[in-house]
Amino acid sequence: MHWPFEPEQVRALLPPELEVDAFDGRAWVSLVPFTMRVATGRGWSVPWASTFPETNVRTYVVDRLGRRGVWFFSLDAARLGAVLVARNGYRLPYLWSAMTLSGPDGLPAEPGSGPGPGPRPGPRPGPGPGEIRYGSRRRWPGPRGASCRLRVRIGAAYRDDELGPLDHFLTARWRLYSATGPAHRAIRASHDPWPLYRAQVAELDDGLLRAAGLTPPPGDPLAHYSPGVGVRIGRPEKYL
């Protein structure tokens, strides 16, 4: 899901080394839930962090050398081990959350990933055909309790000639940026083009953008669905 923002709203939340990468004069912020399946370079699974729900809140940036990429405001994941490795090794703002994701590319709720006592953030039982349900509630480090619940209906696949410049702008990104204190890092990513499907948001109660300091504009967001592709992530490098 993607929302347009005034560039000044987003720029105020970026490090000075990065600038908003605008499309038709607007900054864009995306909320992206998905299932993460982790493997080593040789294709081995990682037992303590192999398959789990994850979601990120991100925007689109360009550095001082003109290289385009993604800046993450937050990355919520249901595996504490994966969160610790990503925070320490990649300096990315990973957070441990109770998460559920079900539907065409989702996972049933699993022990250790559910929200525990109290109201469940979702999903509710029995998603319909072509429907995804997702829920999360942040555990650590905070702001604790930041949550999201959504339901998305999936439509027909896009043909290549039906995709426009904005679709490519939002999905074709090859560099991730992070900054922790004085350390600024860029991480290269490579993947095939995402196969995209039409999607419609049927229900959305989101607090993850608000936790990042952003209030979505009124109206329905632009939405895509993808069954996914393999993504290779490089080592962190200093970018400036």
Whereabouts are the PLM-identified features?
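Short, surface-exposed linear patches
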Residues: D21-G25, G43, F52, G81-V83, ...
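N-terminal domain-onset segments
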Residues: M1-G41, W194-L204, P217, Y225-G228, ...
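Internal, well-folded beta-alpha domain core
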Residues: N56-L240
